[in-house]
Amino acid sequence: MRKRTEPVALEHERCAAAGSSSSGSAAAALDADCRLKQNLRLTGPAAAEPRCAADAGMKRALGRRKGVWLRLRKILFCVLGLYIAIPFLIKLCPGIQAKLIFLNFVRVPYFIDLKKPQDQGLNHTCNYYLQPEEDVTIGVWHTVPAVWWKNAQGKDQMWYEDALASSHPIILYLHGNAGTRGGDHRVELYKVLSSLGYHVVTFDYRGWGDSVGTPSERGMTYDALHVFDWIKARSGDNPVYIWGHSLGTGVATNLVRRLCERETPPDALILESPFTNIREEAKSHPFSVIYRYFPGFDWFFLDPITSSGIKFANDENVKHISCPLLILHAEDDPVVPFQLGRKLYSIAAPARSFRDFKVQFVPFHSDLGYRHKYIYKSPELPRILREFLGKSEPEHQH
């Protein structure tokens, strides 16, 4: 019995040992699993938080980029819509184009009293008001030669009017668009011309400065004609020259053509920074650059100018002018391209109307920097005028 039971006992012991070892490994595995879960609980949220923050930051950045892009797209569509709408607006309302041509509503310099030219350093200048037509009043400045500045102090309008009959020649100055007769570069030119012994008479067209009326090419030309006749009625046999600048060259050639047709031409015509006609000038103007290649540019932008009665056809007018002609133009003119002034000269020079008169073109090199309105700064200007117009003899008393 003892021998038979020993193997059984040994077998039971081995099974118990095996059972205990298997239960131990299971317990160990269970314990490892618990530790792993505990570690995950401890480390999981801390590791997940940076990932969540990064995701949120990326979403915000993408949202901002999307918002910026949407705003840029809206701005782009608005600009594009405005770009397309402007030509149609101008076509439907030709008066807009007329205002852009005249720019009479741009009054610079601001806050000056045109009744007091002495405030602009013109202490030998008188302010007048003339009435070319009913309901139209224009402001006029008359600057006497600089050699008379002492005698001119405190004198009234009658003294200035009588002074036109002196032996000094007279320049009727027709200014361009925008501003007034008190514009800085205009005042500086009056001073130069006055120092050379000329009377200078200038005015603001109807609708400019303190002048009353509605601007138009016809009205501007009629205002100039009225002032010219007013001068001639007081100047006797003194030479009267007409000087036009920029848009004023269009008024000047309109005026001189009319004077030649009635056989009372001026003694000379001076055109500073002239163009050929208003259509070519508008097409060449810097403001037209963004629309120059727009489909139907002429129909949208140029035809409304013509339909408003604005032509300023210098190229046609010079064919009917019979008096000496001097053209001054700076090569670096950014407003009226130099080639338009040269083209006008090439039209005028061979014209039959000038066969008995001198036609001269004087360019000013771009290095001088005179651009559109600073030719008055040229030290050569007195010599140019003296050679073309003749010497103005100064008088020291009146």
From Swiss-Prot:
Per the Swiss-Prot or TrEMBL record, the active site comprises 246, 333, 372
Keyword ATP-binding recorded: no
Topology in membrane = Single-pass membrane protein
Q: Name one GO molecular function term.
A: palmitoyl-(protein) hydrolase activity
PTM comment: the record says:
Glycosylated; glycosylation is required for optimal activity.
Resulting phenotype, residue 253 to R: In PHARC; abolished monoacyglycerol lipase activity
Glycosylated sites: 123
Q: Which processes are annotated in GO (biological process)?
A: acylglycerol catabolic process; adult walking behavior; arachidonate metabolic process; glycerophospholipid catabolic process; monoacylglycerol catabolic process; phosphatidylserine catabolic process; phospholipid catabolic process; regulation of inflammatory response
The places in or outside the cell where this protein is found are: Endoplasmic reticulum membrane
According to its UniProt record, this protein's enzyme class is hydrolase
The EC number of this protein is 3.1.-.-, 3.1.1.23
Give me the Cytoplasmic side stretches, as residue ranges: 1-74
Entry superkingdom: Eukaryota
> Which parts pass through the membrane?
75-95
Q: Which disease is it linked to?
A: Polyneuropathy, hearing loss, ataxia, retinitis pigmentosa, and cataract: A slowly progressive neurologic disorder with a variable phenotype resembling Refsum disease. Clinical features include sensorineural hearing loss, visual problems related to cataracts, retinitis pigmentosa, pes cavus, ataxic and/or spastic gait disturbances with a progressive sensorimotor peripheral neuropathy. Other features include hyporeflexia, hyperreflexia, extensor plantar responses.
What name does the UniProt record give this protein? Lysophosphatidylserine lipase ABHD12
Q: Which organism is it from?
A: Homo sapiens
